[in-house]
Amino acid sequence: MAKEATRVRRRERKNISSGVAHVNSTFNNTMITITDAQGNAIAWSSAGAQGFKGSRKSTPFAAQIAAEDCAKKAQEHGMRSLEVEVCGPGSGRESALRALQAAGFVITSIRDVTPIPHNGCRPRKKRRV
C-alpha cells in the first residue's frame, strides 16, 4: 500500500508592525512571548527551549538568547515596535529587555505586571541554605 503524501502546512506570514512582548521571568526559567495587540501569539521562546537545562535556565545569558530567538521569529512577521510587559522576580528580566532592544525593536513602553498580593495567600517557607 502506497503512503499518501502528507501536506506540509506552512505558517502564513502576518504583516504586523507593532505588538506586545510578554517577558515572564521566574526563579527557574525565562519565557518570552510576542503577541499582537489582541493577544494572539506571534512568536515565543524560552531558555529551556534554547537547550539550557537545570540551573542554567535561570541565568541572564539564557534569557538573552531566548529573547534574541523570539525577536528573530517576530521580525519575520514584519514586527518593528514593541510594548514590553515584564512579570516575575527572576534574574532574566533586564537582559531579555536589553536583547529585544538590541535586536532592532523600537520599545514604546515598559510595564511591570508582576502580581503583588494585598496580603493574600501565605507565602512558602524561607529557604535555609
Swiss-Prot record:
Q: Which UniProt keywords apply?
A: Ribonucleoprotein, Ribosomal protein, RNA-binding, rRNA-binding
Cross-referenced InterPro entries:
Ribosomal_uS11, Ribosomal_uS11_bac-type, Ribosomal_uS11_CS, Ribosomal_uS11_sf
Q: Which domain of life is it from?
A: Bacteria
What terms describe the molecular function in GO for this protein? Answer: rRNA binding; structural constituent of ribosome
Which cellular components does GO assign to this protein? ribonucleoprotein complex; ribosome
Entry keyword Ribosomal protein: yes
Q: Give the protein's recorded name.
A: Small ribosomal subunit protein uS11
| Source organism of this protein record | Brucella anthropi (strain ATCC 49188 / DSM 6882 / CCUG 24695 / JCM 21032 / LMG 3331 / NBRC 15819 / NCTC 12168 / Alc 37) (Ochrobactrum anthropi)
